[in-house]
Amino acid sequence: MDYINMENGEKILLETQQKVTIQRTVDIYKQYRKELGLTQSELGKRAGISQPNITRFESGNYNPSLEFLVKIAGAMGKKVKVTLED
């Protein structure tokens, strides 16, 4: 099993950290969509992505590609920034 060290010294499974990161990403996208007053269908049309895929993404049942994230961000007038941290 692969573990990573957290800032507080705690060790957690890499798989758990990946799930946490994906959920945080989903939450940020969902928050922006709602702030803009867009439905999932409207966002999908703007991004060229089907509404069911937006729903799957927002429910956490979809592991999105970077291209998917960039399309949705662009449809909301946002940019994607990827950072790597120790």
Indicate residue ranges for each PLM-predicted region.
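DNA major-groove recognition helix of helix-turn-helix/homeodomain DNA-binding modules
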Residues: 67-82
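N-terminal flexible/basic segments that precede or flank functional cores
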Residues: 1-28
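Recognition helix of helix-turn-helix/homeodomain-like DNA-binding domains
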Residues: 47-63
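Short amphipathic helical patch at the helix-1/turn junction of helix-turn-helix
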Residues: 23, 34-35, 63
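Residues in the helix-turn-helix
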Residues: 42, 53, 68
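Short basic helix-loop element that most often maps to the first helix and adjoining turn
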Residues: 27-45, 71
